[in-house]
């Protein structure tokens, strides 16, 4: 294959840093010792047939995220269904109903159970089918695989085997964990994006072994064979130990040769690799856990309620069986007319114990209506409908990507309303991975007039808040005017948007910088931007402009900015970079060559990057950019001329949420450079464990006596609405933790951008402190970390300022120790006391462990949100997992419970849908238990009234229809349509969310209250009916009512009472609820009428009962009215007194809206909105509150000074 054009572009190994330099195989580097447990994997390269039999047969590349398969669906799903207490009880009841002891027809017990369980299993099947189809899509992706004939043909991912040679092309994802053999570049270099693994968008450089570089075309693979001996599958993303046996030599392998599944090939036309790990053996899948079957807290509490009712059921059944035994022993001899012709043990007075035991089974079945069999299926239906509302909410539809919100499981809808802590990924979740060059400081002058997103949003919020507080006098400019000024600032001049460049300032554009003072410094600033990097230019033939593939988006934005300023980096060779420089107003450019002598790369430890170049005049320059704290401490005495104003500008940029770097340079003479370069070359070609440390020490020798030129300010573009969303969630009382694989500096900058951090907030950084030159032992490190945590806890507790806010920042290495058993709860205690928590450089496994710690340590509901494969473990570990369905992969979405297109939609998902779903489900369940207790206990009272005979007062069909038809639809409507307040009010009053977080509507106080209401209703329904009807003339002819007439009258009262009760419960009526509530009552009368018209062989004692017996009797209608009113009167009185004496927040809002006070009295409405904010220390609101306190402090100080001055002025005549 022709490779000349690609080879001529770059020989990267000559210009890359010591981190990219590769010792030759003959330089004596020893292979890794591969032996012992954990190092048993053997891979035969290009010989996949060797892996078809054990022990070399490894897992296939098929990946599954489903909970069930064809074999396990029925047993596993049935287990899940009968794991529920109520379903298990009704399974036992259905089995017992087959025997003659049952007081009901067997189908009246079996049919509802089959319907309920079948519907739930169908829902589970449909949801798992959705996961299966997404798996099919991923597994059906194709990649080129080498065949024995030397050709590469496309094959599905799932059919790839260990040992296969695959070819991955540019912008393709790696289908498995591969060993890089060669790339389209002759140096075997390729760029990889690992955002799906560690969240970082910075491109990583991978490089093959020198010995495999010749494998560069199809023919070269015909006879290629080799053996890889390496570590077993493990979750560590950043380590790999192995050896390659090739051409009778052994070559050591390290992570720089490994291409991980779900990472993406960038800036490289193609690579060849051999498959080492497949499917669930890959590191990304090792970092994920099996998709768990999650249950909400409310559902778990519901089980305890059912256990309580089961205890009540067993108690009254024992009372009933004891009563029956008593009646059998002492009264059965007198009741000769009840004895059967053939004696039975059941009625034998000489054996009452046996009679009582047998009757116990009858009683357990008879009183089973205390347990609501339709509760689970009704909740399933309601949750599915709630989920459909989430899916169809246009306010959570992203028009740009065309992606709506999606509830991938409906089991956790109500959990959305009870979240305490949100654990969020950063890259791709909070940010859009887009850096814009926005401002800069050069030679002590700040340039760039556009405002950052943070400044604009904060100014708008401050304008609103200051207006509400009435803080600004009419003589000064209004906050709204100030906000308008900032908005105008942010959109000065309409121009074609340029990716990576949001700068606007006429002083530097179009060559105007030549008129500025300090032109030499400005020229140096631009040259540092254009030269100090490792990027590769690519010409866009359509636009004629260059784009840049860089290791970091910051670097790409610097080059774009330099290009817009007139310094276009357009070419790189193995030893030089070329820049077109515009040095005049005419627009003409000069091509200049800068020879790259050395490049000292950026690392998280160094926090800086330098390049040593020789310009065309022969001058040697060290150009350096890095963190301001690092650069400032390396400045020469004469290099601090601009230190003061630059520091001031950096603070301003930081307050604006911008990422900053300081730029500096140093001139080197030939002699000094030559001496240093000899040492540097010696260090970078050395082989040993201390190589990196040696290189750092030698780099420090040259990176000193720097001269400060200026600083850059780059905006890490947040996703649209992120700061506002975080602010609203904070007002709702939610805590937010950020878990990211990024560097600490990057994470801190994002924290400022989205107002998780702010100026004045005290930062607690927990890090591992190593001794110079030597690593500490594990115990010393643990003691050090524990000491840091203990001191931080004391500092937080001793803080007396109520407005003080703390932010905890910890890196992944330190977190490894902090999550160990002896320390994790101290760490958690510190973290929960901090306003915000940021964990940096964390692995996917650590994300999951932190989530587990918060979930189990606090006992509160956690929500994890992320967009990449590196977030899967965290998403699955949390009580609720939310996936961002971005452009990079679907792993997070596939593992999630809910998916949204943008982070900002989380606000509506929680504050609106979460609040509604929690309240709906809570009220629905409480009502369900109320109506079943009210109904079920009447059976017990009738039993006691009739000598515990085991006879039901209600017809079998009444019992069958009560839960399934006559009372199910109104309660489903309650669970689907109920709204205490509208969605707009939920967003305006975010503190309403605290009702769910505090579980106000499903605590035991409220549950027992509803159960007590059910007991009261049952007493009224039975005894008031008996009092009205018993021994009274029921018909005109003077006849009394029989059992069926009494039972039908009582059942009518129950239908009326429970439906009127639900009508009083509803806050938001729709026509559907009216139809279902009053229609259920009408349906009852229709059923009784039609059922009574059937032949007596079918209707039995119900024959024409409504038409001929009940309807003509006035006492029937009087009893219905009196019983219904008496039943609901206490609840009506309760809700009335509560609204008058102890109203809840939503009661006040409902009243304000009903009387339209929000329109007539805006000041009261604003005051109520302000009160409805949860006191928070993060977000725009906290930032604005801090600003208001600052303004008040300044005003009070000014008034105090004026008062003192006035006092001195009045006293001065006396002193004369």
Curated annotation (Swiss-Prot):
Keywords: ATP-binding, Isopeptide bond, Magnesium, Membrane, Metal-binding, Nucleotide-binding, Translocase, Transmembrane, Transmembrane helix, Ubl conjugation
Entry's transmembrane regions: 75-96, 101-123, 306-327, 360-377, 923-942, 957-976, 1007-1029, 1043-1065, 1072-1092, 1110-1134
Reactions performed catalytically: ATP + H2O + phospholipidSide 1 = ADP + phosphate + phospholipidSide 2
Binding site for Mg(2+): 867, 871
One Gene Ontology CC term in the entry: plasma membrane
InterPro entries tied to this protein: ATPase_P-typ_cyto_dom_N, ATPase_P-typ_P_site, ATPase_P-typ_TM_dom_sf, ATPase_P-typ_transduc_dom_A_sf, HAD-like_sf, HAD_sf, P-type_ATPase_IV, P-type_ATPase_N
Cross-link entry Glycyl lysine isopeptide (Lys-Gly) (interchain with G-Cter in ubiquitin), positions: 605
Cell compartments where the protein resides: Membrane
Enzyme class: translocase
Composition bias, Polar residues: 1198-1216
EC number, as in UniProt: 7.6.2.1
Single annotated GO MF: ATP binding
Residue numbers annotated as active site: 425
Membrane topology, record value: Multi-pass membrane protein
A Pfam family that the UniProt record links to this protein: Cation_ATPase
Regions of this protein lying in the Cytoplasmic compartment: 1-74, 124-305, 378-922, 977-1006, 1066-1071, 1135-1216
Intervals, Extracellular compartment: 97-100, 328-359, 943-956, 1030-1042, 1093-1109
Biological process annotations from GO: phospholipid transport; protein localization involved in auxin polar transport
Ranges where the record places region Disordered: 1195-1216
Family: Belongs to the cation transport ATPase (P-type) (TC 3.A.3) family. Type IV subfamily.
NCBIfam families: ATPase-Plipid (TIGR01652), ATPase_P-type (TIGR01494)
Role played: Involved in transport of phospholipids.
Protein name, as recorded: Probable phospholipid-transporting ATPase 4
Top-level taxonomy: Eukaryota, Viridiplantae, Streptophyta, Embryophyta, Tracheophyta
Gene name in the database record: ALA4
